[in-house]
Every structure is written in structure tokens, then in C-alpha cells.
Design a protein with these regions (language model features):
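A charged, well-structured terminal subsegment
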Residues: 142-154, 188-191, 195-205, 322-343, ...
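N-terminal helix-turn-helix DNA-binding module of bacterial transcription factors
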Residues: 1-74, 356
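Short acidic capping loops at alpha-helix termini that bridge into adjacent secondary structure
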Residues: 192-193, 237, 288-293
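Flexible loop/turn connectors
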Residues: 251, 255, 259-356
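Periplasmic-binding protein-like
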Residues: 131-138, 195-197, 240, 261-270, ...
Length: 356
């Protein structure tokens, strides 16, 4: 027996199928086979069926998308830049709904989403990652470096609830006006002592009482706009900055507020923060809304907190994301898009009442 014939080195390597071998088996030209896969040309149904059958027989999955990208001059990737870690971002129902909207908008184009995070190392990675367009979601006001890098690369930029910047297509939400509506609702009920529990104002997620200095240094565009909306009604309303948009963060912020002051209403900058506020109030023996009115923002479905029907502003996060995705595709096609501002709807729930 010839041992050499049985060694791995001597074993014949399987021949990898390619477009040419598929075309030969199907009895067509390589260009016709390519069109059968891409669907971009006039290929009859019978010819396409013959090509796909040959590909299946040879276990050929189709042309390398990298080659297609090179020929088109595009990567087929739309980047989405988040201001926080992916894990934290996916804890926020609004981020998920916005991403869902973006994916819905770009799906028919064949593009894929690539999630990126905005951190200290971002400008370096932004210079090399292959992208056709980029969507910035709720990123901090320190966006100039990232925008500069993407602009230098000629990559179209869409910003969802970001600080207005030249060269960035803005898809915004009426954060200031919506917060003013919430505050006005409380004032109409008779409240004059409202305190805010805000979203984080910096990348370190520093908690504590809101000061004018912290407001001036705020890196959180959405949080700052919502603060301004409340201040349009309650000019001197105090605030406490939460560490995140979570129930636990809302609980700890509200516990600190209620340990030091006795407001008749708390304006939470997200619904999940509001749930934490309500839990802290109950722990301190306060009834909502009899002793303390609480409002939120977003209009998310709050599982496991029944029978709470939160007074809040309902924002169209999916539609906002869809507009961002459509805007990115339009910019790629050289179409000039106009900025858009989405409006939130007021929902009167069971968590607000006149002060005692």
C-alpha cells in the first residue's frame, strides 16, 4: 500500500466553484450568469433557473460581494454611530425603535447596518471603516471631530437629535416644545414647584444636582433641549442629573431629590426614569399622583409596572429612524434633502393631579 497516497498532503483538494464553472455547467456566458445572480439585466426565467440549478449543484453561493462593491464604488454599508455602548443602547426602547426604522428604510436598497460607538478612539476608527453613509443617533455635542472625519471622506451624514452642524442632515424631535407642553400641563393643574430628573449631561454619566455651570457644559443635546422646555414654564425649576436612562437611575435620582426637597411634581426626561421616580416616591410613602405628580417622555410600553398609566409625550421613534435611513439613501443618490422635525403627542395618564 502506498502510504503517500493516504496522507493529507497527498489528498486531492476540492476544486472551489466559481462563476465561470457555473456558467459552463449551465451552458451560458459568464456575463449572463452574473446577471442571473444580480437580477440587474434581461435574463429569462428559464435561463436564470438553469444558472441557479448549476450553482446549487456546484455548491456555489454567488459572486463575491466584495467584488461587487469594488465595481459599484460602494461598500453597501450604512453606519450608525451611537453615543453609548451597544449594550446600553439596546436597553433603550427608543434606540431600538429608531434603529428598526433605519433598517426598514434601507432594506430594499440591499444595504446593511454597521453599529459604531462614539468614544475617545472613534475618530481613528471612523477614518478607516468602510461606509457609504452614516447616521448619528443622539450623540454628544462633541461631534465636530467625527463630522470632520466623515466629511473629509465624502461620506453623507444624517444626525438624529444631534446638535445642528453644517453638512449634517438633521432629523430632529420637538424636545423643547414637547417638554414645555408637559410643564404647562403641570402648571395648569396648579403646580408651581416642579423638579426635573434629567438624562446624563456628559460622557462620564456624572450624577448630582443640576447647576447653571453643568447646564453650560452639557454634552447632551436632547437633555439640554428638554431642560429648556421645562424652564420655558418653570424658569427656576431645579433638576437632578441621572446616571442613565434606566429605572434604577431614576430611582436613585428621585430618592436624592425627595430626601432633600418636597416638590409637588417631578418631570422625568424619559419614561423609564419616571418609573424609577414613582418607585422612589412609593418607598418614601408618597402616593402618585395624590402626593406627587410624575410625567415622563417617550411613550414606551412599560411592562411589569401596571397599573401605571404614565402621563407622557409619545414620540414617533420608528418614523424618525425611517426618515434618517431614507435621508441617507437620498444623499447617496445626490438628492438634496431638507431637515425634518417630528412632533410628539401628549398623553394624559393617571400619574398627574392637582397638588394638595
Amino acid at each position: 500500500m502506498d502510504e503517500a497516497a493516504t496522507t493529507p498532503e497527498a489528498a486531492a483538494s476540492p476544486v472551489r466553484a466559481n462563476l465561470a464553472s457555473v456558467a459552463a455547467l449551465a451552458g451560458v456566458s459568464a456575463s449572463t450568469a452574473s446577471l442571473a445572480f444580480s437580477g440587474a439585466g434581461p435574463v429569462s426565467a428559464s435561463t436564470k433557473s438553469r444558472v441557479l440549478a448549476a450553482a446549487a449543484e456546484l455548491n456555489y453561493a454567488g459572486p463575491d460581494p466584495r467584488g461587487q462593491s469594488l465595481r459599484r464604488g460602494r461598500s453597501g454599508i450604512i453606519g450608525v454611530v451611537l453615543e453609548e455602548s451597544v449594550a446600553d443602547a439596546f436597553r433603550d426602547a427608543m434606540n431600538i425603535a429608531t434603529l428598526d426604522g433605519i433598517a426598514d428604510a434601507i432594506g430594499a436598497s440591499g444595504s446593511a447596518l454597521l453599529l459604531l460607538t462614539d468614544n475617545a478612539d472613534s475618530p481613528s476608527s471612523f477614518r478607516t471603516v468602510p461606509l457609504d453613509a452614516v447616521v448619528l443617533i443622539g450623540c454628544s455635542t462633541r461631534l465636530a471631530d467625527a463630522v470632520h472625519v466623515f466629511t473629509q471622506r465624502g461620506i453623507p451624514i444624517v444626525g438624529v437629535e444631534v446638535e445642528p452642524l453644517p453638512g449634517v442632515l438633521a432629523i430632529d424631535l420637538d424636545n423643547r416644545e414637547a417638554s414645555r407642553v408637559l410643564a404647562e400641563h403641570l402648571r395648569e393643574l396648579g403646580h408651581c414647584d416642579a423638579t426635573m430628573v434629567t438624562l446624563p449631561l456628559d460622557g462620564a454619566h456624572t450624577t448630582g444636582w443640576l447647576t447653571r455651570e453643568r447646564e453650560a457644559r452639557s454634552e447632551g443635546y436632547t437633555a439640554s433641549q428638554r431642560i429648556l422646555g421645562v424652564r420655558d414654564v418653570f424658569a427656576e425649576a431645579p433638576g437632578y442629573v441621572a446616571s442613565a436612562s434606566t429605572v434604577d437611575a431614576g430611582y436613585h435620582a428621585a430618592f436624592a431629590v425627595l430626601a432633600a426637597t418636597t416638590p409637588t411634581a417631578i418631570v422625568a426626561q424619559s419614561d423609564v426614569l419616571a418609573v424609577g421616580v414613582i418607585r422612589a416616591a412609593h418607598e418614601r410613602g408618597l402616593r402618585v399622583p395624590q402626593d406627587l405628580s410624575v410625567v415622563g417622555f417617550d411613550g414606551v410600553r412599560l411592562d411589569g409596572v401596571a397599573p401605571i398609566d404614565l402621563t407622557t409625550m409619545v414620540q414617533p421613534a420608528f418614523d424618525k429612524g425611517r426618515a434618517a435611513g431614507a435621508g441617507a439613501l437620498a444623499l447617496l443618490d445626490g438628492v438634496t434633502e431638507q431637515p425634518r422635525v417630528f412632533a410628539s403627542d401628549f398623553h394624559r395618564g393617571s400619574t398627574t393631579a392637582p397638588p394638595r
